[in-house]
């Protein structure tokens, strides 16, 4: 049996924010956390998210986009919502999990040139990393970075 704490990260589409957050937390503190992500209306993982994570040395190419219902009945230590919409519609079946929330800009809504859109994805990736580093630090987990 693993002593890793179980973390579920939720956003609407499970295509950008929660996918990047899953990749970051697995990479930076995966020895302490078993991390999953899901969405309330999942779509495909955004190519921009894959690209900016690759720039950070993290490969999320094979991450599937999952619906939150796939985790019904499973126990988690932490459920983190990374968008206001999902916080409001978050299922109640996560029992005693500690629920945390921070709204991050949706990079999938970015407009402009490809470079301008990638800049938004990079900024959100970096904001997620700071948030998740603090999440792990407060739980006495030394990140691997």
Located regions from the model:
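Alpha-helix C-terminal capping/helix-to-coil transition sites in glycosyltransferase folds
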Residues: 73-75
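Short, charged/polar "capping" segments at the starts of alpha-helices
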Residues: 43-45, 86-89
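Phosphate-binding/catalytic loops
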Residues: 87-145
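Short, charged/polar surface micro-motifs in flexible loops or helix N-caps
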Residues: 59, 85-86
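A generic structural signal for alpha->beta connector loops
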Residues: 32-34, 77, 96
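Conserved active-site segments centered on acidic
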Residues: 1-69
